[in-house]
Amino acid sequence: MERKENCSSEGVLYYARILFVWVCLLGNVGHAVAKRLKVEVETPGTLPELVGKKAKYKVTDLTLKGTLNGRDLCFLREMAGRDKERQSTPGRLRTLDMRGVSFARGGGGYVRHGEWREVQGEHTLPPYLFSECGLAHIVLPERLDTIAEGALGATRISRIVLPENV
């Protein structure tokens, strides 16, 4: 009498392959989903701690409120695809709402563009801030009165919301 096996090695291998594909697909779902984040920076220089290392390169849509200094701006550039030396990063930030932001001196340079660039004033979008970054949409601070040289240069921005007084 011939014995039938319910679990042939070929059948097990087939189902193991299917299971492996599903695990791979499900494991990558988190990377494909856009991540939105709202952050209030009460103390200038603390954006890196508020966002965290794990979320830094995953956030695609960020709303900021508070006062930012050079350290925060350096971190923000990295989130948007460029570091302070203007080298590419894995940052995926594409939408940035800075409506409730002002700037504070301090925290060091955030980008080297000929020379180290630093915050110039409370209501001035700093020079070369988003130069060469991957942003597509940006809402500028409500109280902004000046956009410094190159602040939005060489970007992929397709939509900018300007405050009335600029």
Task: Indicate residue ranges for each PLM-predicted region.
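Acidic Gly/Asp/Thr-rich repetitive segments characteristic of extracellular carbohydrate-active
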Residues: 38-59, 77
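Bacterial N-terminal signal peptides
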Residues: 16-28
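Structural signature of tandem-repeat unit edges
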Residues: 35-42, 60-68, 86-124, 133-146, ...
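N-terminal extracellular ligand-recognition/capping segment immediately after the signal peptide
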Residues: 66-77
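N-terminal secretory signal peptides that target proteins for export/translocation
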Residues: 1-15
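Sec/Tat signal peptide C-region and signal peptidase I cleavage site
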Residues: 29-34
